Amino acid sequence: VAEVISMPDTAAAFARPYVVSWNLTYRCNLACEHCYLDAGPNKVKLPAFSDRSELSTEQCYRVIDEIAAFAPECVTILTGGEPLLRRDILEIIRYGVAKGLWVVVGTNGVKITETLAQLLQTESVRGLALSLDALDAERHDSFRRVKGAWENTVEGAKILTRVGLPFIVQTTVGAHNRHELAALAAFAHDELGAKVWNLYFLVPSGRGSYVSDLSPAEYDQVLGELAGIQRQWASRMLVNAKCAPHFVRTLLSEESPAPFPKSFTGGAGGCPAGTHYLGIRPNGDVTPCPYLPLFAGNLGDAGLREIWDTSDLFTRIRQRDHLGGRCAPCELKSLCGGCRARAYGMTGDVMAEDPLCTHQPGTLQSAVDTLKPADVGAVEYGQPAAAALRWEPEAKERMQRIPAFVRGMVTRAVESWCEKNGVAVVTATALEEIRAQMPTPKVFGTRDSR
């Protein structure tokens, strides 16, 4: 159950996205120096080179219809800019939830109040993602370029905890905070109540093109530290590296076990751009990754499924056999693939090697050779696994809280555990016992202590 399983490297693996990150607006109440969207106060329209405005409420409804038809129950992150600045944000959330999407709100947390948190809970938002980049207000506010941002975000997180809405804390690592990463993780969990701590590795895009201040060797050191933090918080808080698919190399290199799968089915692991993930810009432009300023089409001109299935950009970015530089011969390319947005931002070639990676191909071949096929194979997105055991109603209901793209695999894994342990009927108690043995906690999908 604890294994994370990558999809097979076949056309079926790319049938639908698991996650859609949708930038609803360029407007923002902060002016973060690393913003990939170059968002900020008073930005209503796109930059001067475009005559397209942000999508209207009705246009957003049509986009939601397309997402729901193409990728039922997919995780849909409504972000910005600051999405809570849109006057119609609750209407957009309500419509998305009604269509069966797993709606998550990506926000800086500054605008969260008790009233708003309760409204978001009423609208059945699955969770929120908040940004926090330092333990002290001065450094965070300097990075976010608005005085008082830290205090408001921290208070917003505490409000969410009181209301009972789960949330993620997002931190972008840099010279300003790399010395306090372990303390930031502890603060996110112990002081704020976060279910997840995501550490982002900067991608040179938007304003972020100008603020990278860590060398590849320093990033390697951070990844090593992050592996230790991940082990420290196992079973209490999920700890992830974001925009760092080569984290797999760090984990495979370690002699001591980390909460990462030492088995796989091969295929599209690592960077999910264009394989499991896509981004939508405020004007409807579609990209394989929000950090990648290359666009495969616009939803005003073509349907989402058509863009996903037929665009040259999506087709190209999936072809890991066509990667360049050190990524081409790398034994980890099916597990990693490098960050395509970083490759483009630093070289101008979306298929180039990831300049942040220091790995020399071939040096981990022996570790890769020891990997075995996963015990629980992939199940096509959204398809239920055929139940071999009887499930109690409460256990069935809980499974519906698990995202559709892994529900079939989790069902198989649960039944496999039950069969090995002589359990004939899947009960809520059995699920609790299984969950207690997992290296990472449950995150979204429940609002009570069960």
For each feature predicted by the language model, list its residue ranges.
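Aromatic/hydrophobic pocket-lining residues that form π-stacking "cages" and hydrophobic walls in ligand
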Residues: 63, 92, 96, 156, ...
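Conserved alpha-helical substructure of the radical SAM core
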Residues: 2-123, 127
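Cys/His-rich metal-chelating microdomains
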Residues: 27, 31, 35-38, 274, ...
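Flexible mid-to-C-terminal extensions adjoining Fe-S/redox cofactors in radical SAM and related proteins
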Residues: 3-16, 291-383
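Radical SAM enzyme [4Fe-4S]-AdoMet core and its adjacent flexible, acidic
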Residues: 1, 23, 46-50, 55, ...
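Non-catalytic accessory segments flanking P-loop/AAA+ NTPase cores
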Residues: 381-450
